A protein has these predicted regions:
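C-terminal domain-boundary segment and adjacent tail
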Residues: 27, 63-167
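Active-site-adjacent pocket scaffolds in enzyme catalytic domains
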Residues: 1-92
Length: 167
């Protein structure tokens, strides 16, 4: 099984194909990149979180969600960085993909309030550069790395797929 990975896999409708595929590599454009029968999969971090235990015994499962029950914290940040998918040839780049399930109203206070502001302040003071991007922009960055781009730059955000017409 693949966990915490970035790779291309055939789109056959069979869930077992998700367990195999072609890993993304810096400077290498696989033939399946433009194939309509392949998907580019970017996993969110999945890991055992031994710092947060259920009933004080069992580790909780980290699944990269941001909710009131699972707000961003410095401990989760360190876990995300430790287990984040990386690209072969660019191990210094970690892709921490988080999700909010459409930001339902019960999570608004966490997403827009002091918890998120404190977290953003925390990560700004770390030695790791952080870029907040959309899914489209992340795919563009991945394709730019495949095409041999070096350090992160804003033009990478529109490298392969341009912004929608309304932007």
């Amino acid at each position: 099984r693949r966990v915490n990975a970035i790779y291309y896999t055939p789109d056959t409708g069979d869930h077992r194909t998700l367990a195999r595929g072609v890993p993304l590599q810096a400077g290498v454009v696989p033939s399946c990149r433009e194939a309509h029968d392949h998907l580019l999969l970017v996993h969110g971090v999945t890991a055992l979180n031994w710092g947060r235990r259920k009933w004080g015994v069992l580790p909780r499962l980290e699944n990269s969600d941001l909710t009131m029950a699972n707000p961003p914290t410095p401990d989760r940040w360190r876990l995300w960085l430790r287990h984040a998918p990386r690209i072969a040839g660019r191990p210094d780049w970690a892709f921490v993909k988080l999700h909010t399930h459409g930001a339902p109203a019960p999570n608004c206070d966490m997403l827009l309030g002091p918890q998120m502001r404190n977290f953003r302040h925390f990560i700004q003071n770390q030695s790791v550069p952080v870029h907040f991007v959309t899914a489209r922009e992340m795919v563009n960055v991945l394709h730019a790395v495949e095409d041999g781009s070096g350090d992160f730059a804003t033009p990478m955000l529109d490298h392969h797929y341009g912004p929608p017409p309304c932007m």
